[in-house]
Amino acid sequence: MNEMSKSEITDKKKRYAAGVLKYAQMGYWDGDYQPKDTDILALFRITPQDGVDPIEAAAAVAGESSTATWTVVWTDRLTACDQYRAKAYKVEPVPGQEGQYFCYVAYDLILFEEGSIANVTASIIGNVFSFKPLLAARLEDMRFPVAYMKTFAGPPTGIVVERERLDKFGRPLLGATTKPKLGLSGKNYGRVVYEGLKGGLDFMKDDENINSQPFMHWRDRFLYCMEAVNKATAVTGEVKGHYLNITAGTMEEMYRRAELAKELGSVIVMVDLIVGWTAIQSISNWCRQNDMILHMHRAGHGTYTRQKNHGISFRVIAKWLRMAGVDHLHCGTAVGKLEGDPLTVQGYYNTCREMVNEVDLPRGIFFEQDWGNLKKVMPVASGGIHAGQMHQLLDLFGDDVVLQFGGGTIGHPMGIQAGATANRVALEAMVLARNEGVDLKTEGPEVLRRAAKWCKPLEAALDVWGNITFNYTSTDTSDFVPTASVS
């Protein structure tokens, strides 16, 4: 669909006498354009209104996300407008989705402020999603040049250093979210944390909406949680942690909470995605300066990532967060209660953990991405998972992942500590079997049953949750046509 390779009106007399021109005529469409290594590339899924030409719609996306407005302006002549215009350079029908098109847009690097995700988002998604000629639009993927990557500090700790600090290697890390999310007193909250850590978990965590409410002030929570962490560390001889949620109404308050977490000896703090890009980059800098691991809860993402025809793919959010600088990121489970096609979720994990992402259409990765020297992010699998799924989780995601069993720990019929022990034994059994060459995909359930014979907590977990699944159709799957290079 690129037959309209060049439609720009370059004659200045005609151009500036025209008043209103189509975006393609203003220079925002160039079907012959070859993207440069230094361009920022974006792939949009667009649904034009009836009667709107897809190429004109693509040009409008390029224009409205760079320099255009609805009419020709004389001040274009005061700029290097040919360089500053984004260029839509390819439009393709989305396979199996009538009326939807993939449009590829290239942006010159000079359009963006270095080291600022806020500026990237203001340009790429700031205006075009409300544009009337489009029924819907979704940002599917982006590619950033290495030159731009190097303007970001990235994760403050990274997977390698985190494992060194924890002295834990060769297996996924285990965690749990304290439940119920809201309503516990500080003392009871701390007791839950202690039981989980003593039972074998590496981390316990606050949930996204526990901040500083009347039933439990944040200081009380921090004090009781760190008392629990220190006691569990002493009892088990392992480094333990609790994700202390420092999310607050102002940056000043977030820093105040982070400082107390540091004074109390915490190795990790947590913020929610909803604090915003500037706050995320700011607290990441603080974590880097204070040798603190930064856990990111993706609270709110589903409002704009879940529907495949409008919004932003989570793989793009994951890229922005790696650049902004987080160490942990919730990326989905594929087998739990939250939205997640297995291949698509693996694409999110690869975005976090690989130093170079190759094109992988089944996993939704449309561009090769070289991450330069940015550290890797530890993905987190959380939401409706239990010990009976351990073989699936290990098979899907490998070792570099935090597996968080909230209800699958706190809801154990023998108690919280038993729930933690069940998860730890299930994990250790799976890792041992895998290292001995067992195919976890086919033999995993049998490995669990054998381990449960000498572990009552695991046996009880399998009895209660063994058949629990969340088999619903995923709303966000990759649309692509297999090519010779992608099977």
From Swiss-Prot:
The active site is at K179 (proton acceptor), H297 (proton acceptor). It catalyses: 2 (2R)-3-phosphoglycerate + 2 H(+) = D-ribulose 1,5-bisphosphate + CO2 + H2O; D-ribulose 1,5-bisphosphate + O2 = 2-phosphoglycolate + (2R)-3-phosphoglycerate + 2 H(+). Binds 1 Mg(2+) ion per subunit. Keywords: Calvin cycle, Carbon dioxide fixation, Lyase, Magnesium, Metal-binding, Monooxygenase, Oxidoreductase. Pfam families: RuBisCO_large, RuBisCO_large_N. One of its GO terms (biological process) is reductive pentose-phosphate cycle. Substrate binds at N127, T177, K181, R298, H330, S382. Mg(2+) binds at K205, D207, E208. CDD domains: RuBisCO_large_I (cd08212). The record marks K337 as: Transition state stabilizer. The modification N6-carboxylysine is found at K205. GO terms for molecular function: magnesium ion binding; monooxygenase activity; ribulose-bisphosphate carboxylase activity. Its EC number is 4.1.1.39. It comes from the Bacteria. Its cofactor is Mg(2+). RuBisCO catalyzes two reactions: the carboxylation of D-ribulose 1,5-bisphosphate, the primary event in carbon dioxide fixation, as well as the oxidative fragmentation of the pentose substrate. Both reactions occur simultaneously and in competition at the same active site. Heterohexadecamer of 8 large chains and 8 small chains. The basic functional RuBisCO is composed of a large chain homodimer in a 'head-to-tail' conformation. In form I RuBisCO this homodimer is arranged in a barrel-like tetramer with the small subunits forming a tetrameric 'cap' on each end of the 'barrel'. Belongs to the RuBisCO large chain family. Type I subfamily. This is Ribulose bisphosphate carboxylase large chain.
